[in-house]
Design a protein with these regions (language model features):
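Active-site neighborhood of phospho(di)ester-bond hydrolases with catalytic His/Asp-centered motifs
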Residues: 31-33, 48-58, 81-82, 235-240, ...
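Active-site-proximal loop/helix segment associated with metal-binding centers of metalloenzymes
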Residues: 121-236, 240-245, 252, 259
Length: 329
């Protein structure tokens, strides 16, 4: 399994936000940027990707604090979200005077904003006093908002009386070579790379690969020299109405998640209030977890009407999930 650390930034009844660290590839990721004062300053300085659900204050107030810690550091930070996130970021940045920036290391924010089936790409560069520069427009495909060779982030547009985004980050299963066996083969470095490419492509199943003076079948090499590194899927859902359409969209997005971070704002007895303010109840959160067949549920964004008594939410979730193997933490 990839080496991924992930955890909530705040208490369950405080601002939403999840931090995710993929140290071996140098990615430090935020999902939402509300109050982030509890996050270690050294980690905030490393953050290079931010996925924002929407820009209500409790999901966006921490941008200024992050900006303050980024100044003096040369870095590119990628930000993803739904319209009007680029406008919101622009106005945040223009709330300050940027003279003397010629003496500052270059900090750049690259914003990818979703709107009506398209992504709008913008650049904000401290050397240009964070002027809003439109870069390009691209067609959104396959519900993917970000992808690299290691993982991808899918999204869904959900209803919170405004459009908001839900996210799911997924590392696929990976074919790995058994190093101890590979070392025994008469193969040079580039030849090992060719072998891996050969085995990663299932279209080669009827072909053979030459090692030394002998040819081996695809199946034989696959069974003897490889193993599968299990991937991981981590999803983040908050600030959504518990409507049939939302629940269906969320279920598709977070299907088979290893970890589902999902709001659980109200007890079921307060379902009328939940509908009024477009949030989920414990019953709806549990329903999503069951329908999506998730392994672990991490609930958050508990209503402050229950004070610090988080057990009220946890106990009710446990009741709704008692007939499942889903772990609540």
């Amino acid at each position: 399994m990839p080496r991924v650390k992930h955890y909530l930034i705040n208490e369950r009844y405080e601002d939403p936000g999840m931090f995710l660290q993929i140290e071996n590839i140098g990615d430090y990721i935020l999902f939402d940027i509300g109050n982030i004062y509890k996050l270690d300053r050294s980690l905030i300085k490393k953050i290079n990707k931010i996925f924002i659900t929407h820009t209500h204050m409790d999901h966006f107030i921490g941008f200024d604090y992050l900006l303050r810690l980024k100044l003096g550091k040369q870095q590119v930070v990628e930000i993803f979200g739904i319209y009007p996130v680029a406008e919101n970021i622009y106005h945040k940045l223009q709330g300050y005077i940027w003279n003397l920036v010629e003496f500052e290391p270059q900090i750049i924010f690259l914003v990818k904003q979703y709107k009506n089936g398209y992504f709008y790409h913008y650049r904000f560069d401290i050397k240009k006093k964070f002027k809003k520069e439109f870069i390009k427009r691209t067609k959104a495909k396959n519900d993917v908002i970000y992808e690299n060779k290691d993982y991808k982030v899918n999204f869904a547009v959900l209803d919170h009386k405004i459009p908001v985004l839900g996210y799911s980050l997924e590392f696929p299963d990976k074919l790995k070579l058994k190093k101890e066996l590979i070392r025994e083969l008469p193969l040079k470095g580039y030849e090992i790379g060719k072998l891996k490419e050969f085995l990663e492509d299932s279209r080669n199943k009827n072909k053979k690969f030459k090692i030394g003076n002998k040819h081996y079948s695809y199946k034989e090499l696959l069974e003897k020299l490889t193993f599968t590194q299990k991937g991981i899927k981590i999803s983040y859902i908050t600030d959504v109405l518990g409507s049939k359409e939302n629940i269906e969209k969320i279920t598709r997005l977070v299907k088979d998640s290893d970890y589902l971070y999902c709001e659980s704002v109200f007890l079921e007895e307060d379902s009328e209030q939940a509908s009024k303010v477009y949030h989920l109840t414990t019953k709806q959160t549990a329903e999503i977890a069951k329908l999506a067949n998730v392994r672990n549920l991490i609930p958050f964004h508990f209503s402050r009407r229950y004070g610090k008594n988080t057990n009220l939410i946890f106990n009710e979730l446990s009741k709704f999930l008692e007939d499942t193997d889903i772990k609540i933490s």
